[in-house]
């Protein structure tokens, strides 16, 4: 398990570095207003994916050990196509500010992205974490290569370079996933069983509960973008989105751990083992994340202005406000994957609902008055409420003593020893 976590973390770190370079390139070329347009475009695609992943989401990971590939794949693909068509036609009702020329692209990109995600979740469900990680890493690699050609070699400065880059990233990732699952795809049409009632029932059952939480969580995490666009302007969205992206990079630690944790729990039947595993991973995740957040908070405004451009110096102030909530949300990510792994998706939904109440009340109150500062306060409080809700229920149902929540030196030494062992083994394998 530890080896898979290390591999996942390494992949996510590499992807984060590339995504950071992408953010820098877009900020320098497009400016704060153009970066705001890009952030809203990507966020709108993510909004459509919430509905696609009612069937094509994390429920695939949970159901992969229990249903044939063909049935899950066919049901997921048809559903994602339907959602892309419906949402593509009605997306401007949700976001009237989306440029008409981008509507069709948003619809098509959401469909291709969903196909790529289906492959990714099959790989995770089979606990083929290495392959899933390589599949994920390909997206930012293809994106930055496309952006480099479009903006640096061709010297263009419009948003369509980013759109073309997304096409390359999503489609390339999908093709790689097909290759990694080629045995399953080769047998796709050999299975003559056309009874999809059971798999559809399970996909909707688990997917609806899980995606309800993701739908609510989407507004917790990204409603501030749309409120800033409505009450202030896209330039403020650009600065705020960059600050959020940098701060949320801390979640690479917890999401790397949670991905392996989720696959392990979904394939295990021991509740006590799942609880102990979750607690141990939460403690080490918090310790590492706290150190990383301190480093981010110490960086001055001049650093961000130098890296992203003179319009982005305000990122430092935003990141410092977000920091406590970012740290608390690390706990939410680990505990949320615990509840998803045991099939209790509704717990994540209830936690997200609590956070959404905070987001709506504070967002509509603070953002029109305090712009990005109000948005940062809103997000930080919402993140914290999410984590507290799940933590309270987790400690109530788990039989842990108070001192079990303390990270001991012996545990740190064990983690370090395990890391050394895995790196040593990896070096030996490479020789």
Please place each PLM-identified region on the residue numbering.
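Membrane-interface junctions at transmembrane-helix termini in multi-pass inner-membrane proteins
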Residues: 59-68, 114-138, 266, 324-351
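Hydrophobic alpha-helical transmembrane segments
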Residues: 133-185, 244, 354-358, 372-396
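Membrane-water interface segments that mark the loop-to-transmembrane alpha-helix transition
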Residues: 4-15, 40-41, 45-97, 101, ...
């Amino acid at each position: 398990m530890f080896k898979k976590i290390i591999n996942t973390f390494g992949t996510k770190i590499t992807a984060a570095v590339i995504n950071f370079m992408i953010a820098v390139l877009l900020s320098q070329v497009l400016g704060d207003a153009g970066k705001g347009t890009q952030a809203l475009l990507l966020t709108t695609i993510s909004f459509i994916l919430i509905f696609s992943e009612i069937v094509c989401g994390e429920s695939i990971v949970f159901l992969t050990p229990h249903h044939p590939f063909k049935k899950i794949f066919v049901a997921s693909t048809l559903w994602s196509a339907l959602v892309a068509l419906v949402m593509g036609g009605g997306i401007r009702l949700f976001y009237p500010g989306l440029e008409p020329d981008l509507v069709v692209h948003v619809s098509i990109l959401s469909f291709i992205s969903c196909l790529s995600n289906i492959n990714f979740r099959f790989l995770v469900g089979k606990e083929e974490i290495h392959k899933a990680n390589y599949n994920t890493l390909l997206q930012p690699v293809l994106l930055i290569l496309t952006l480099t050609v479009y903006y640096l070699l061709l010297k263009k400065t419009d948003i369509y370079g980013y759109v073309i880059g997304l096409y390359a990233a999503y489609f390339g990732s999908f093709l790689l996933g097909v290759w990694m699952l080629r045995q399953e795809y080769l047998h796709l049409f050999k299975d003559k069983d056309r009874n999809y009632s059971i798999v559809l029932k399970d996909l909707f059952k688990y997917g609806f509960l899980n995606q309800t939480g993701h739908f609510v969580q989407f507004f917790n995490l990204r409603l501030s973008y749309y409120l800033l666009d409505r009450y202030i302007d896209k330039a403020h969205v650009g600065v705020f989105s960059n600050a959020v992206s940098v701060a949320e990079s801390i979640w690479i630690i917890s999401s790397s751990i949670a991905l392996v944790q989720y696959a392990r729990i979904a394939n295990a039947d021991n509740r006590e083992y799942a609880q102990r595993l979750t607690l141990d991973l939460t403690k080490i995740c918090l310790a590492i994340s706290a150190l990383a957040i301190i480093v981010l908070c110490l960086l001055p405004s001049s650093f961000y202005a130098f890296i992203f451009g003179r319009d982005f110096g305000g990122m430092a102030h935003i990141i410092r406000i977000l920091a406590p909530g970012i740290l608390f949300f690390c706990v939410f990510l680990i505990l949320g994957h615990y509840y998803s792994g045991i099939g209790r998706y509704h717990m994540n939904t209830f936690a997200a609902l609590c956070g959404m109440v905070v987001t709506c009340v504070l967002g509509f109150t603070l953002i029109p008055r305090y712009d990005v500062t109000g948005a940062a306060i809103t997000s930080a409080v919402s993140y914290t409420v999410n984590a507290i809700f799940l933590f309270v229920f987790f400690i109530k149902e788990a039989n842990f003593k108070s001192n079990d929540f303390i990270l001991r030196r012996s545990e740190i030494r064990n983690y370090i020893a395990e890391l050394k062992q895995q790196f040593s083994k990896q070096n030996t394998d490479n020789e």
